[in-house]
Amino acid sequence: MIKTILLISFILENIFDFILVKLNDNYVKKPLPENVRDVYDEEKYNKWINYRNDSKKFSCVQTLITALISLGLYIFNVHAKVFGLFGTGKIVSNILLILVFTLFSTLISIPFSYYSNFVIEEKYGFNKTTIKTFILDIVKEFLIGIVLMLILFLGVMFLFEKFHNLGILFTIAAVILFNVFVSLFSMTFLRIFNKFTPLEDGELRSSLTALCEKYNVKIKNIYVMDASKRTTRANAFCTGFGKKTISLDDNLVNNYSTDKIVAVFAHEFGHAKYKHVLKSMWFAFFRISILILSLGIILNFPVICQAFGFEDVNYFFAFSVLTMISWPISRIFDMASNKISRTFEYQADGFAANEGYGESLIGALKQLSKDALTNLNPHPFVVMLEYSHPTLSQRIDAIRNPKKK
């Protein structure tokens, strides 16, 4: 009975995802909002429609195949059968189980990643990744993911085993500290995949530095990241507690005018000025606490893991169960988190506009959307559930009419 309920929950989650795709599919046929109709000319508009259709079909096939594979693993108790093959201690067996299924998940994802990059993205001019970079990225992601997962998993297992129910509180604290650690060393992780070169002296660097000095914000350095070795898309970010590190994609530096780049940075600087990252972390900590409490409940009921063939509680599989039962709650958290994030985006846009970069930011956002073939007309319900940023039309309207927001 427990197994049936959990499997139904898993199936419903995937059906819900397909419903969202269908909603977007129907809504995209509506006329574009007036203030974004100049983003695509007829040729670019048709290219966007084709790109969207290809991406949608691929995403649906990927979701269906991975869901069927996962469903098969759950129905036939594959996790428990693999776990039973090891016949060693609890800790070693769990570590081996993590290694096996993380490797399995990685191998399953490789054909999809390859098709996405070297067929769809290549077809529409986005992909710049070589086979060598593609393979190296997979290896690096796998190794880093395994190390971080084992640290997190072994820590959680130790705390629950040592302190039992009280371990929930210690686990919440440990996972929060783990997330802070990952945030603090985000640049270190990025350097494993990308090369960062200091931005040369000139008009752009002077403009960025002047904005920071105006608000007494100290900078570690301003870097240009070699994003062009993987994609034609562009981005920028500002990170760090205390002294800030600014990173601009080389695609942004090479293909956008100085005023647009400064406008994009002013937006990112607005996030730093208003401490949006720190504020978002508090909500993330609350979410983590709820999920750990839910995990504690699962671990206190061995019958849940036993329904999938285990003799007792299995910590690794308990995380899988957590994803199956928590998706409705996660959707609610996602909706709240995205609402907060969209509010922060409006504030950051407003900061850039108040600095005199409103129209330059609009121009940059339009160019970014055009270059990335962004969906300019997503369904409002999908935006509410899944979009961390307002739509381009909403952002333009808010920049030009700030009193409406």
Role assignments for model-derived ranges:
Residues 314-320:
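Loop-to-helix entry region at the N-terminal start of transmembrane alpha-helices
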Residues 321-325:
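Alpha-helical transmembrane segments
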Residues 3-313, 328, 332-405:
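Polar-ligand-bearing catalytic/cofactor-coordination segments
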